[in-house]
């Protein structure tokens, strides 16, 4: 599910060079304008069916060349799920509060994925070209994930295809799209990241930010003990979401079987979610005042940040890992992203905004090491002619997307997929690979 500020809808963000005034201390209500719609649920885009190239005419005596399909032709990786795999926030490399151009790596067409490159196939799926699906090296990528998707398709204001076989006037579910795509491609690996929106994580973050902005340091109102938040993490709800994820994974297996694949011809990779913020002690802005949100875009009390890492994230990822076991397939692997951004998270000590670390832009030497890999939680900065979307909040930005791609390439393992946990290589001195990605390490599963 995706929520947004009550500002005029835009078919795509406009690239405008603008200088924002320093955040002045105003009545609290000013800071709350639009912040009730912080969205984490983010982005998948359906793709138009690709025409299979017809080989040149052969002598009449030659056997016809086989068309690409199960086990035949160029290998493909397909990604399914929600915003954490679709490419949401993949436009922005770090952040600046003074000039958006300093962090604008992909520009206003960042999420254009239709055949002509002129717009989105599904509005607000936000499938960026920096998304992890495109590992290269002779492997083709197809991104069917959608920002805001849950395990089941939603046909509300914005169509959000789930991992099911839905087909209607609004579009198709991701499992149906996978089945159709796999019939004419040699799909060797399907990567799934889903479940966060089933846990209502967007509304959880919304509650945490609102509680931070509306309570004083001497009487902190925490979100982790709000009944609306706690309800998402009861044993009953965790079991329910785990069951839904199992159903989604079963749908993936059914789609591949219907397309003509045996389990030995492809691998299912279940991908967990990364921690987007450090514990409270690792946040570089004080709890006092509004700087933590107005400057850093990370308006959480320390205890809520600690809870997010000690309880919320492990619970969500545990449900995914449990579902991977429950589905009972012999071709399942796991990519654990829990600590993939540690040291580069939003508001974390050791990294900062471009103006804080003294770098001109994302193209500056060392930018990948000194700036954040997770996008700010945005509120009033999305109003008017802003190039930002609320739904980009708290998602892997350009560096984060490329880091996950580097991890996934290691999982692909030259066509022999393996499981693993991903972390930053050379933490504190992160560097780019020759392909322009952060160098990551795939270690054993924790």
Segments the model singles out, each with a brief description of its role:
Residues 99-240:
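Conserved SGNH/GDSL esterase-like catalytic core that processes O-acyl groups on lipids
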Residues 63-79, 171-190, 246-267:
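Short amphipathic alpha-helices and their capping/turn segments at secondary-structure boundaries
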Residues 2-64:
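Secretory targeting and sorting signals
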Residues 83-87, 146-152, 196-201, 274-278, ...:
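Solvent-exposed loop/turn segments at secondary-structure junctions
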Residues 75-92, 100-104, 197-199, 398:
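Catalytic nucleophile-elbow at a beta strand-turn-alpha helix junction centered on a G-D-S/GDSL motif
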Residues 70-71, 87-93, 153-157, 201-206, ...:
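Short, solvent-exposed loop/turn and secondary-structure capping segments
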Residues 275-395:
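Mobile gating loops/cap/lid regions near enzyme active sites that modulate substrate access
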Residues 130-141, 241-268, 304-336:
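A structural motif corresponding to the C-terminal end of an alpha-helix
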